[in-house]
């Protein structure tokens, strides 16, 4: 019988550790094909090496809770222990029953899942999907602005419950009308207006013009590890996308 081989996920990545190493024994037989003992006292034998154990760090209750949150929704949840990098929960929805991919019907079930172009249950949104960053991204822009010297901790902006970022385009903010925020209160309140102004300062004042400012901003983000593969122990993933000046030129036309 053939040996089972890890083909996907964790089993694939750690196949070399989970498999172990086969051993060999050389035996001596008589003319009646009966074993009479080890050949040359076993000096050519190769001992086998047992496979290593693999312990997942998933928190079962947290995993169940994440799956409940994404029931009848599309999205992904990744929960990581910052101090160790352990993955406590990894959820993708819509999902599928893993039992469908074992047994005699696995090929038929796989084709059915692969052909579902609406729900895409085989697409791991926790590892492969690309989403716009949320409010934690604001702190990176704050660090970049401080590094470039375009703001300091006392830089203050007024928030009128949002701001215009294009012609007729308004982004709401939960800050009260007329709130003045410096860097610390802007982070504390997660003020959209404050960090929109910080981003504009980075782009306008970091380099010699907007193009250079955008590219400087991107360089800083790459230094934080964004836009790169994480190097984790799963064989799939996306490195993310950070736009540069040429991207904006393409979509908004140079000088527009």
What is each residue range found by the language model?
Residues 1, 55-57, 76-80, 88-92, ...:
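Soluble periplasmic/extracytoplasmic beta-strand elements of cell-envelope proteins
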Residues 35-76, 80-83:
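Conserved, well-ordered alpha-helix/loop/beta-strand core segments that scaffold catalytic motifs
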Residues 30-45, 83-136, 140-256:
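Beta-lactam-recognizing serine transpeptidase/beta-lactamase-like catalytic domain environment
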Residues 17-20, 69, 130, 201:
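Mid-sequence acidic-hydrophobic segments that form the walls
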Residues 1-51, 89:
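Small/polar-residue-rich segments within soluble enzyme cores
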């Amino acid at each position: 019988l053939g040996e089972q081989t890890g083909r996907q996920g964790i089993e694939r990545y750690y196949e070399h550790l989970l498999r172990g190493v086969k051993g060999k024994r050389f035996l001596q037989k008589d003319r009646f094909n009966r074993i009479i003992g080890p050949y040359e006292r076993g000096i050519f034998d190769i001992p086998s090496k047992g496979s290593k154990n693999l312990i997942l760090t998933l928190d079962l209750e947290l995993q169940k809770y994440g799956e409940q949150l994404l029931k009848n929704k599309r999205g992904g949840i990744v929960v990581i222990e910052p101090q160790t990098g352990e993955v406590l929960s990894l959820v993708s929805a819509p999902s599928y029953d893993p039992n469908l991919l074992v047994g005699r019907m696995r090929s038929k079930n796989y084709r059915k899942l692969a052909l579902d172009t609406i729900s895409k249950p085989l697409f791991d949104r926790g590892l492969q999907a690309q989403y716009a960053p949320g409010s934690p991204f604001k702190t990176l822009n704050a660090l970049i602005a401080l590094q470039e010297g375009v703001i300091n901790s006392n830089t203050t902006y007024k928030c009128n419950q949002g701001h215009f970022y294009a012609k007729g385009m308004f982004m709401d903010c939960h800050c009260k009308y007329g709130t003045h925020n410096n860097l610390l209160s802007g982070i504390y309140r997660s003020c959209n207006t404050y960090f929109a102004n910080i981003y504009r300062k980075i782009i306008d004042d970091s380099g010699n013009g907007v193009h250079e400012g955008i590219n400087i901003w991107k360089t800083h983000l790459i230094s934080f590890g964004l836009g790169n593969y994480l190097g984790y122990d799963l064989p799939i993933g996306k490195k993310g996308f950070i736009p540069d000046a040429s991207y904006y030129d393409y979509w908004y036309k140079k000088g527009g």
